[in-house]
């Protein structure tokens, strides 16, 4: 199984960007931990980060038929990007949305996700651990779907 991990705008600044909100772990720290978790689960990761909405969409298009699912932190595009949501639905890649902070306890403009209704689920407010929980949840959901299809 191959899982993509897609990170959106400003996540490259983790560790220094508003540590009281996002924590002190860098994106590299989070991805290194996730690689270890993936190894224990027997899955491979493909990771990408971009500050550009178009680049994130291109990555999803490129991952079509390559990855089995995606863990995504779309950053601020979560709240604004119908195009990113459309890329997920157009590629039919199942995904779990993760956020370091609890978006539902943030400013009003950050409380709505354009992606959530198309996702398998959302994990928010658990800091860097949310990525691990998202990966584990996605792998489990995909395994259950495969079992259901096989016995269907």
From Swiss-Prot:
The keyword Repeat does not apply. This is 3-dehydroquinate dehydratase. It catalyses: 3-dehydroquinate = 3-dehydroshikimate + H2O. The gene is aroQ. The keyword Amino-acid biosynthesis applies. The lineage of its organism: Bacteria, Pseudomonadati, Gemmatimonadota, Gemmatimonadia, Gemmatimonadales. CDD domains: DHQase_II. Its EC number is 4.2.1.10. One of its GO terms (molecular function) is 3-dehydroquinate dehydratase activity. It comes from the Bacteria. Belongs to the type-II 3-dehydroquinase family. Transmembrane segments: none annotated. Homododecamer. InterPro entries: DHquinase_II, DHquinase_II_CS, DHquinase_II_sf. GO terms for biological process: amino acid biosynthetic process; aromatic amino acid family biosynthetic process; chorismate biosynthetic process; quinate catabolic process. It comes from Gemmatimonas aurantiaca (strain DSM 14586 / JCM 11422 / NBRC 100505 / T-27). Pathway: Metabolic intermediate biosynthesis; chorismate biosynthesis; chorismate from D-erythrose 4-phosphate and phosphoenolpyruvate: step 3/7. Keywords: Amino-acid biosynthesis, Aromatic amino acid biosynthesis, Lyase.
């Amino acid at each position: 199984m191959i899982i993509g991990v897609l990170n959106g705008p400003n996540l490259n600044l983790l560790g220094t960007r508003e540590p009281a909100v996002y924590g002190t772990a860098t994106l590299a720290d989070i991805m290194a931990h996730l690689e270890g978790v993936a190894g224990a689960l027997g899955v491979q990761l493909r990771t990408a980060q971009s500050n550009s909405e178009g680049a994130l969409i291109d990555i999803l298009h490129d991952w079509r038929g390559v990855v089995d699912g995606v863990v995504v932190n779309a950053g601020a595009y979560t709240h604004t990007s119908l195009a990113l949501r459309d890329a997920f639905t157009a590629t039919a890649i199942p995904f779990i949305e993760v956020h370091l902070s609890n978006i539902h306890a943030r400013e009003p403009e950050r409380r709505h996700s354009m992606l959530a209704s198309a996702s398998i689920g959302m994990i928010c407010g658990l800091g860097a651990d949310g990525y691990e929980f998202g990966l584990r949840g996605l792998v489990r959901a995909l395994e259950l779907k495969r079992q259901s299809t096989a016995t269907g």
